[in-house]
Amino acid sequence: MKKILFPTDFSPAATNAFIHALEFAKIVQGELILLHTFDLPIYDNQYFPENYNVIFDSLQLSQFDAFKDEIPKLRAIAEEQNLDKIKMSHRLMDGDLIYNIKKVIKEDKIDFVVMGTAGETGWGTFFLGTNTGSVINAIDVPMLSVPLEAKFKKIKTIGFTTRYRTKDKKALKEVITIAKKMNAQVRCLYVKTSTSDVSETTIKKWDTEFAKEPVIFSVIPSDEIKETIIDFILFKEIDLLVMLAYKRNFFVELFKPSLTEKFANTSSIPILALREKKSRNFEEVAAG
């Protein structure tokens, strides 16, 4: 069974992403591991010689009580979505969020991470400084990032950006594995710039190789890569965007307000970020 880590702070953004996590678990036949982290304040025990441990025990207990109170709410949401059969377990950890996420990924052999984000400027705020934006560059497993505005709906069209590289072909096959489970279509975009070195022969070979798959290729000549991707998301009605090995700065530029303000709905779709580092084989992970 595939293991999906769902870090949560029980905020509205996290609760919204929880529904996506449940649906994703259903698709890949997985289980959810809910993680809540908290930071204990640093005290100098020379000033609290007698009650130092009492203070920490009290803080830890209050965190546990809050965690314990929230779990039934999530289980109620699962029941409302008719997904209460999805196996769920829980972890409550103190310390740094990213450190704990990486620790759980290693200890529990996590296959995917699903995490919510929120911000007035949508993805721009997300990639510039939120916890989710930091996590996406720190882990080596696929991560589904869900903005607060992205209410769950059936995914019919998956967008995938490519530069026709060998590693892109491998990733596309992996995306197709997911798409078939969702009964969705993949729309593959290549933005052909004036300096592009991809030959027509390569493009035709890909067309032939994937002819029997649920994939439509679009080659759009433009030197405005980010703007073209945003247009593609809007006009092809993309429900989920999949991107491979892009750096954080690329996402910041792609989803900055100046680009997305005229297309409000581009900041309300989930993004599945695939990691280039082959710590685990995504296709094996995705297969159920």
Over which residues does each language-model region extend?
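Small/aliphatic-rich secondary-structure junction motif
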Residues: 1-54, 157-219, 238-240, 266, ...
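Short beta-strand elements of ligand-binding domains
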Residues: 116-117, 142-148, 271-275
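Charged helix-capping and loop-helix junction motifs
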Residues: 128-131, 202-204, 255-260
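A short acidic, glycine-rich active-site loop
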Residues: 53-66
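Helix-enriched interaction subdomains in cytosolic or periplasmic regions
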Residues: 112-138
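Structural beta-alpha unit
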Residues: 72-113, 210-261, 269, 276-288
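Short, structured interface segments
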Residues: 132-150
